[in-house]
A protein has these predicted regions:
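Active-site rim helix/loop that mediates acceptor-substrate recognition in acyltransferases
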Residues: 20-59, 165-197
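Conserved beta-strand in the GNAT
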Residues: 47, 53-61, 69, 74, ...
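A conserved beta-turn-beta hairpin within the catalytic core of GNAT-like acetyltransferases
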Residues: 62-70, 80, 205-219, 266-270
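Conserved acetyl-CoA-binding loop-helix of GNAT-fold acetyltransferases
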Residues: 75, 81-95, 117, 224-236
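Conserved active-site alpha-helix within GNAT-family acetyltransferase domains
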Residues: 86, 110-128, 251-267
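Conserved GNAT acetyl-CoA-binding A-motif
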Residues: 95-111, 239-249
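Conserved catalytic-core motifs of GNAT/GCN5-like acyltransferases
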Residues: 105-107, 125-140, 265-277
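Amide-forming acyltransferase catalytic core, primarily the GNAT-like/NAT-type
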Residues: 122-212
Length: 282
């Protein structure tokens, strides 16, 4: 079957939304996130058509370190297993190389054998396993611990972030986006105003890459963990937002215990991040 690939735009975004809402009716976000994808990111939203019919979509987004993040892969149920996903991956790889991305990455659930197999077919391999835990903030009011302020000095922010790097096993996660730890990611988090600390050097990195209205994400925290999580819950609630999520390596028993103490509910299963390092042309 031959497919036509076209770039997503405001002219055809309704077709892309239709694909997602048929594919994942309970996990849609493209309708709410179209402006961010089309206006605020480098990288194309690709749509696949069979004749005039939209059958699949996928987004490549360039992250702060220049890597290509492969997201929003959706193939309508009747078209799965018919090469639509392969066509999107081939386009992603071509685009990432043209953008000189040093790597490409994606995430999927640990039980999604088809998704992992497709990624492996295009040279991606396992880079990490993470689990999420979420606190619903609609049931009670939280008080903000005193002393947490945005970190104004990037050098200080970098020291804090590097101190938590090993515990996060070299990725920080927001909105199911896995950012490789390093200078470019640290600067992005700091420039976005996401790094907070108190005078005792307890710190939390909290914000959202996108879809802020659905809640915030703690990418990393350090020091007095319970104090940091109390700050994260109260700060999120102050913004009028309904939930805050933390993602971390599941074998970290200390983080798990702190989250459970503070009322976070863990996801039923883990997610994996897969990665391929790309060779530079020339």
């Amino acid at each position: 079957m031959e497919y036509t690939l076209e770039k997503g735009s405001w002219e055809n975004i309704s077709d892309a939304v239709q694909v997602e809402e048929e594919t994942l009716p309970n996990s849609c976000y493209l309708r709410d996130n179209s402006a961010y994808f089309l206006n605020d990111t480098v990288g194309d939203l690709t749509m696949v058509r069979a004749g005039d019919e939209p059958v699949g979509i996928g987004k490549l987004s360039v992250l702060p370190d220049g890597s290509g993040w492969l997201e929003t892969l959706r193939v309508r149920p009747a078209w799965q297993g018919r090469g639509v996903g392969k066509a999107i991956y081939a386009r992603w790889l071509e685009e990432a190389q043209s953008l000189e991305c040093p790597a490409i990455r994606m995430f999927t659930g640990t039980g999604n054998v088809r998704s992992r197999g497709l990624a492996e077919r295009f040279g991606l391999s396992l880079a990490g396993t993470y689990i999420g835990a979420t606190a619903n903030l609609l049931t009670q009011e939280y008080c903000v611990p005193q002393g947490f302020e945005p970190v104004r000095d990037f050098r200080f922010a970098r020291v804090l972030l590097e101190s938590g790097r090993w515990e996060m096993e070299d990725f920080v996660v927001m909105n199911n986006t896995f950012f490789r730890c390093g200078e470019d990611t640290w600067r992005y988090l700091w420039e976005q105003g996401m790094v907070f600390a108190d005078e005792q050097y307890n710190f939390a990195v909290i914000g959202a890459r996108m879809l802020r209205q659905r809640g915030l994400h703690v990418a990393m925290y350090g020091g007095d963990g319970v104090r940091c999580l109390k700050f994260a819950k109260a700060y999120t609630q102050q913004q009028g937002l309904p939930a805050v999520t933390v993602s971390y390596p599941p074998q970290n028993s200390r983080i798990r215990a702190e989250l459970e103490r503070e009322g976070f509910v863990h996801d039923a299963s883990c997610r994996i991040v897969m990665e391929r390092i790309l060779e530079r042309k020339g």
